[in-house]
């Protein structure tokens, strides 16, 4: 049970780091690029500083290079925390944003759709299974083109997502909702704030991650 909860917690927060994946899974590579008018700049040496109430500070840097994984172009990022520096991958195609990486405790590769630049009310669900136990991550576009203030700074052109988290009932027979939260992304910036909470079989956790500083090159 503790492993399942740790798995869930680790993939809950977008800002969490992901271990570098064997790039033989994909092919190619090249210089990064992409307009900053979307929700994830990828230009080389762009930087973001975050603070998580659970995990402490983190520093993310866009490497400005990419690789092809599962036929999709993924941009490379390094994130440094007190535990060290790890590699993450982000894909953005036609307004659909994905993240990809290894989850160490079970050695499983995970690919998540974490954002869609779609109409209000659009929703989608990522299903992730480990050893026959599945959890479900539902995102809904709640608001678009709003202002949102984080650590005293007001961001424009923000999209707000609501998040619902459900798991297979380990006692069998149903899926139960155990938590949820919200995510905020600003155009030309990226993730600016995320928070969540969950409670499952007597174990609960909350986290808020906020953007402190950023530089887009």
Protein language model annotation of sequence segments:
Residues 21-217:
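Conserved functional acidic sites
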Residues 13-16:
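C-terminal motif of bacterial Sec signal peptides marking the signal peptidase cleavage site
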Residues 1-4, 18-19:
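Positively charged n-region of N-terminal signal peptides that target proteins for export
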């Amino acid at each position: 049970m503790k492993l399942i909860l740790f798995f869930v917690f680790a993939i809950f927060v977008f800002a969490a780091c992901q271990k570098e994946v064997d790039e033989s899974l994909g092919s190619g590579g090249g210089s990064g690029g992409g307009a900053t008018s979307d929700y994830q700049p990828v230009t080389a040496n762009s930087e973001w500083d975050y603070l998580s109430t659970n995990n402490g500070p983190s520093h993310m840097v866009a490497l400005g290079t990419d690789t092809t994984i599962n036929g999709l172009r993924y941009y490379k990022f390094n994130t440094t925390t007190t535990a060290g520096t790890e590699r993450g991958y982000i894909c953005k195609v036609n307004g659909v944003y994905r993240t990809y990486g290894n989850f160490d405790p079970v050695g499983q590769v995970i690919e998540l759709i974490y954002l869609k630049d779609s109409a209000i009310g659009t929703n989608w669900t990522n299903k992730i299974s480990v050893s026959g136990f599945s959890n479900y991550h539902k995102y809904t576009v709640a608001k678009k083109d709003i202002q949102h203030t984080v650590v005293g700074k007001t961001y424009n052109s923000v999209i707000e997502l609501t998040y619902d988290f459900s798991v297979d009932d380990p006692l069998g027979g149903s899926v139960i909702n155990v938590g949820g939260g919200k995510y905020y992304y600003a155009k030309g910036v990226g993730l600016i704030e995320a928070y969540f909470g969950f409670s499952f079989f007597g174990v609960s956790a909350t986290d808020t991650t906020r953007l402190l500083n950023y530089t887009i090159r």
